[in-house]
C-alpha cells in the first residue's frame, strides 16, 4: 500500500494559494484516476483507490500545514506502514515554477509541513517537490506562499498537474526518474537521459549523433583570398580546389 499525501491548508480561503499546490496535485490525481469520493478520517480528507494494481490512499491533512504530520502519521500507524510507503507532495520555494524534484529522505528545508512529517512519520519517505519560485526577498516569502497563483501561472501549472495525474502509477512503480522526465517534457524541457545537443560556432544546434567533422567547418569562416601573392602560395600548397 502507498499513501500519497498532498500538503496544504484547509478551507476556501487558502484553496488557490501557492502553498496548496500539494492539495492541488492529489486533487488532480483523484479526478484523473479511479478513487472513492473524499471522506473524513485521520484528521484529514482521504480517498481510496488503486494505481498499477496496488492499493493507494490519497490524503489531504486538515490540521493546517504546520501539523500535517499528525494526520499522515495517524494514517500510517493505522495501516502499519513504513516511511518507504509514503510520498509527500508539496511546494518548493527554491525551485523555479513548473520544476519538479523527487527524492527519498533529506531535510525539511524550512518547510513546516515537512518538519511535521519528519517528526511523526520518520524521514525516509519520498518527497515530491513542486516549484513555486522565490519572490527574491525574504520578507516577501509569507505573502508569496500564501498568495494565490496568478492567471498566467496556469500556463505551467495545468500541464504540471495533468502530467502528474496521468502518470501517477509511476509513483507506485518507483519510476521516479521517468516521472520527472515526463513532467520536464510536458513543460517544454528535456528528459534527463537525453543528451544535450551540440552547438557550433555559428550558434546552430545539431543533434548529438551528427558528425563533428562537418560542424568544424563553420559557414561563417572567412573566404580565402582568390588573387594576389597569398592566393598563389595557397594554390602551390593545396592545389586549385574549390571549397
Swiss-Prot record:
Record-stated family: Belongs to the PTH family.
Keywords from the named record: Cytoplasm, Hydrolase, RNA-binding, tRNA-binding
Positions bearing the site annotation: Stabilizes the basic form of H active site to accept a proton: 91
Residues forming the catalytic site: 19 (proton acceptor)
Annotated InterPro entries: Pept_tRNA_hydro, Pept_tRNA_hydro_CS, Pept_tRNA_hydro_sf
Name of this chain's protein: Peptidyl-tRNA hydrolase
Chain's gene name: pth
PANTHER family reported for this sequence: PEPTIDYL-TRNA HYDROLASE (PTHR17224:SF1)
Upper lineage: Bacteria, Pseudomonadati, Pseudomonadota, Alphaproteobacteria, Hyphomicrobiales
Residue ranges, compositional bias (Polar residues): 212-222
Amino acid at each position: 500500500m502507498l499513501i500519497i499525501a498532498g500538503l496544504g491548508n484547509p478551507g476556501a480561503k487558502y484553496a488557490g494559494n501557492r502553498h496548496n499546490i500539494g492539495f492541488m496535485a492529489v486533487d488532480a490525481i483523484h479526478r484523473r484516476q479511479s478513487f472513492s469520493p473524499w471522506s473524513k478520517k485521520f484528521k484529514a480528507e482521504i480517498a481510496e483507490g488503486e494505481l498499477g494494481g496496488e492499493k493507494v490512499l490519497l490524503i489531504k491533512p486538515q490540521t493546517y500545514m504546520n501539523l500535517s504530520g499528525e494526520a499522515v502519521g495517524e494514517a500510517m500507524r493505522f495501516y502499519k506502514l513504513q516511511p518507504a510507503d509514503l510520498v509527500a507532495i508539496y511546494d518548493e520555494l527554491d525551485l523555479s515554477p513548473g520544476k519538479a524534484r523527487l527524492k527519498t529522505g533529506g531535510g525539511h528545508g524550512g518547510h513546516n509541513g515537512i518538519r511535521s512529517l519528519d517528526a511523526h512519520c520518520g524521514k525516509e519517505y519520498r518527497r515530491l517537490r513542486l516549484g513555486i519560485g522565490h519572490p527574491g526577498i525574504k520578507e516577501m516569502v509569507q505573502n508569496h506562499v500564501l498568495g494565490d497563483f496568478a492567471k498566467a501561472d496556469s500556463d505551467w501549472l495545468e500541464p504540471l498537474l495533468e502530467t502528474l495525474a496521468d502518470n501517477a502509477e509511476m509513483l507506485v512503480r518507483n519510476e521516479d526518474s521517468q516521472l520527472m522526465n515526463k513532467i520536464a517534457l510536458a513543460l517544454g524541457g528535456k528528459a534527463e537521459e537525453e543528451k544535450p545537443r551540440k552547438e557550433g560556432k555559428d550558434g546552430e544546434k545539431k543533434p548529438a549523433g551528427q558528425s563533428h567533422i562537418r560542424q568544424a567547418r563553420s559557414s561563417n569562416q572567412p573566404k580565402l583570398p582568390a588573387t594576389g601573392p597569398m592566393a598563389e602560395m595557397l594554390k602551390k600548397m593545396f592545389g586549385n580546389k574549390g571549397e
